Amino acid sequence: MALDKLDLYVIIVLAVAVAAYFAKNQFLDQPQDTGFLSNDTAGGNSRDILETLKKNNKNTLLLFGSQTGTAEDYANKLSREIHSRFGLKTMVADFADYDWDNFGDIPNDILVFFIVATYGEGEPTDNADEFHTWLTDEADTLSTLRYTVFGLGNSTYEFYNAIGRKFDRLLEEKGGERFADYGEGDDGTGTLDEDFLTWKDNVFDTLKNDLNFEERELKYEPNVKLTERDDLTVDDSEVSLGEPNKKYIQSEEIDLTKGPFDHTHPYLAKISKTRELFASKERNCVHVEFDVSESNLKYTTGDHLAVWPSNSDENIAKFIKCFGLDDKINTVFELKALDSTYQIPFPNPITYGAVVRHHLEISGPVSRQFFLAIAGFAPDEETKKTFTRIGNDKQEFANKITRKKLNVADALLFASNGRPWSDVPFEFIIENVPHLQPRYYSISSSSLSEKQTINITAVVEVEEEADGRAVTGVVTNLLKNIEIEQNKTGEKPVVHYDLSGPRNKFNKFKLPVHVRRSNFKLPKNTTTPVILIGPGTGVAPLRGFVRERVQQVKNGVNVGKTVLFYGCRNEHDDFLYKQEWSEYASVLGENFEMFTAFSRQDPSKKVYVQDKIAENSKVVNDLLNEGAIIYVCGDASRMARDVQSTIAKIVAKHREIQEDKAVELVKSWKVQNRYQEDVW
């Protein structure tokens, strides 16, 4: 009988959890509107999707929901290949650029592709949020829609590919016809590109065999025409030298301190302070403070800061050598779209050097589909054969390219034995090399105590490969360069950057940034206890939470218990913000407790945060009984799963229930936002 009651209890809890989820988590502090998304349609097109399709005579629509640029890149590449192989008139569209009132009127002679990523805890990407709301709550019949969906996700997350699966289900439920099978890719297993290629091949088979489209010989057809401008130089004011957008080129005429600031328009923030938190032979970590006092850029504790990157001098030199662009660095060119729906990806006219430094992802891994696409431009027949062979062999590509972490230039020069690829059109490079995207960091400051300053905490990424190459993080090494220069440490950086920026706009020590809202928030009720779990830089937003509660106490506000579980390798080497925690404890008193785990301090015993959680299970259970909210930040692949498993075991033990029931109960807390994660 007791088990029957327990089953009923779990069912009730899950029902309440679902209700809480759709109530938009009213008991939590809601993120402020920071103006992340712009409502302006890129390229000046109508926001009427049906009108745009008809006006431009398109019969294939590819919609992307992208947070880091991968889904957008896939949509663009798929569009080009569908057009080239089958002659379909394709159009790539950002969800954020259109309204959806008449989406159900799209006729059945138009094929619609959805390339959508899942972000955070099963949420749509920022640009797909409005469409997600429309599809979920407002869409009626979609009986004339012919669609297919590819979802991008990470299986280390609880809600793996939730948005792709949801879109596919809802589109069918509302009457849509799936013309090709749903597909999904898993970044957690490192097979995202391969999963996409497999799905793409299946779609092409469907287009040929079921829809009877005739396949043509694949050839490169540019969407843009490049014209060099001999009448312009780098000294001309209209020429872009890497500015984020045209507003920055016209900066003397426009007030750049006013938002909204978003993924199309950042704020150029001064870096007021940097300091090294630790340094070791393997890695180091920097603390960076951005001054936003001269702008209307706002954030709330728990949000993310997007930092806009540029490429290192070393990777630029290698890329320039690879494509034989040495004598074109300062040459100005202009792009003209050959398709009225194609969006030029950066301001122009612009220089070759500015594109390579500020707009292309030249430091990241190269994909197999890029290998196959560029093979036709190989410098000789032997290299073409090598490229085609490697590109068509998944295992050989994995062994020779992926596992060695070769970027575009590394891979091309490796396959050609150092011969430059001078015949590759720069239009091809612009269309096929992914574009640089902002990198996102959990904010480690409190908007209550630091209203005009945004802090981030970043581990500087440098990996030494067997062949002597250094694989470096783009933004983290840029921040390290700034820390070295700002503090005049005399340290030699692994790679070097142009810190002055286009037209010296980044002097002294400025970078483009914007804020991305997050649901990772402290409870509205300040007396609610919280359990914070964050090893390594996962402690960053949790530091912000603790600082928030410290400020609340200073303001005379009552706060609940705050328990922090923190882990690092060694107490003396990489203990982040070590001196600060005792200061916070002196203010919070009995309402603050910290447990530390050191994984490499004792050679005979590795201790992780989940071990400390288990060791203090009574503390955890008592707080949960008092309504505590759990916050986990850090590695999704192992730590977050191990922590969740440990919490479930604690619940099972102290509440005397079966572990599978405890697992379901903990999952229900996630839906209620009683168990929140900010993981990567």
Swiss-Prot record:
Q: Where is the Flavodoxin-like domain?
A: 60-204
Instruction: Write down the required cofactor(s).
Output: FAD; FMN
Keyword Transmembrane carried by entry = yes
User: Per the UniProt entry, what is one GO biological process?
Assistant: ergosterol biosynthetic process
Domain (FAD-binding FR-type) spans 264-509
- What's one GO-annotated cellular component? cytosol
Residues recorded as binding FAD, renumbered to this chain, are 439-442, 457-459, 473-476, 680
The UniProt GO MF terms for this protein read: flavin adenine dinucleotide binding; FMN binding; NADP binding; NADPH-hemoprotein reductase activity
**Cofactor: how bound:** Binds 1 FAD per monomer.
Q: What is this protein called?
A: NADPH--cytochrome P450 reductase
- Pfam families associated with the record: FAD_binding_1, Flavodoxin_1, NAD_binding_1
SUPFAM superfamilies given for it?
Ferredoxin reductase-like, C-terminal NADP-linked domain, Flavoproteins, Riboflavin synthase domain-like
The top EC class is oxidoreductase
What the entry lists under PANTHER family is as follows:
NADPH--CYTOCHROME P450 REDUCTASE (PTHR19384:SF17), NITRIC OXIDE SYNTHASE-RELATED (PTHR19384)
Q: Residues that bind NADP(+), according to the entry?
A: 283, 537, 599-600, 606-610, 642
Which Enzyme Commission number(s) are on file for it? 1.6.2.4
What chemistry does it catalyse, as a reaction equation? 2 oxidized [cytochrome P450] + NADPH = 2 reduced [cytochrome P450] + NADP(+) + H(+)
Q: Where in the cell is it found?
A: Endoplasmic reticulum membrane; Mitochondrion outer membrane; Cell membrane
Query: What does the sequence similarity comment in the record state about its family?
Result: Belongs to the NADPH--cytochrome P450 reductase family.
Q: Does the keyword Metal-binding apply?
A: no
Alphabetical UniProt keywords:
Cell membrane, Endoplasmic reticulum, FAD, Flavoprotein, FMN, Lipid biosynthesis, Lipid metabolism, Membrane, Mitochondrion, Mitochondrion outer membrane, NADP, Oxidoreductase, Steroid biosynthesis, Steroid metabolism, Sterol biosynthesis, Sterol metabolism, Transmembrane, Transmembrane helix
- Organism for this UniProt entry: Candida maltosa (Yeast)
Topological type in the membrane: Single-pass membrane protein
Cytoplasmic side residue ranges read 24-680
